[in-house]
Amino acid sequence: MNFSRIFFFVFACLTALAMVNAAPEPKWKLFKKIEKVGQNIRDGIIKAGPAVAVVGQATQIAKG
């Protein structure tokens, strides 16, 4: 009887520790992925800026 109570207490403590330690990890990974996507979009827009300007000038030259 005492062994089962001790076993249950140890199991409950280990489960609680596992949940507390594992909880923040996925949240931060999700935000880091979102941040990385935002940085890639920003960098793509910055790199595409001169090309868009050249295309705009070319269309104006073509229109006359």
Swiss-Prot record:
GO terms for cellular component: extracellular region. One of its GO terms (biological process) is innate immune response. It comes from the Eukaryota. The keyword Transport does not apply. The modification Lysine amide is found at residue 63. It is found in: Secreted. Residues 23-26 form a propeptide. Cecropins have lytic and antibacterial activity against several Gram-positive and Gram-negative bacteria. This is Cecropin-A. It comes from Hyalophora cecropia. The lineage of its organism: Eukaryota, Metazoa, Ecdysozoa, Arthropoda, Hexapoda.
